[in-house]
């Protein structure tokens, strides 16, 4: 059995073909899919859970699981309400991981200090919910700036949890 560990199934670009796409995946031997719940904005991070609930249990479809998290460029939206929503989503049985979270210094987005603070808040929620993390980390060209910051944050705020995770986006050498 194959497992797709990172699929943005809630993206609108798949809306018209989502059921057929999942059916083709199942026919090709994909038995499970982790739908990444980041949405187009932080408030939409529940979209992957919605897809899971729509398709789970249907014949000829892979088993779907979801993650929930705030993408680095959306961390400026991580107010108390959004963080409470993340906490609630991580309590749902189908939501098995927190992500895609991390740091992205390559594209212009949320300021670096906002990304770092947002990541720390999400790590705290994931640890409290005992959910692994899915990390997205991308630095500027030819530098390790994002990676240096990420490892410092993980050492201080994630390692003590004893939980694991997956490095999804890698741009290092």
List where the protein language model places each region:
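Mid-domain alpha/beta scaffold segments of enzyme catalytic cores
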Residues: 1-173
């Amino acid at each position: 059995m194959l497992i797709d560990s990172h699929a943005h199934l809630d993206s609108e670009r798949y809306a018209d073909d989502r059921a057929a796409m999942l059916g083709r995946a199942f026919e090709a031997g994909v038995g499970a899919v982790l739908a990444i719940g980041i949405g187009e904005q932080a408030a939409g991070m529940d979209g992957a859970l919605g897809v899971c609930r729509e398709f789970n249990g249907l014949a000829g479809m892979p088993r779907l699981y979801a993650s929930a998290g705030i993408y680095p460029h959306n961390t400026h939206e991580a107010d108390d309400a959004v963080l409470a929503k993340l906490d609630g989503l991580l309590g749902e049985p189908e939501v098995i991981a927190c992500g895609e979270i991390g740091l992205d210094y390559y594209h212009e987005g949320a300021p670096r200090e906002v990304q770092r603070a947002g990541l720390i808040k999400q790590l705290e929620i994931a640890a409290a919910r005992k959910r692994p993390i899915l990390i997205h980390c991308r630095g500027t060209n030819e530098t390790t700036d994002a990676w240096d910051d990420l490892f410092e944050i993980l050492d201080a705020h994630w390692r003590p949890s004893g939980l694991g995770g997956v490095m999804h986006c890698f741009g290092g050498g």
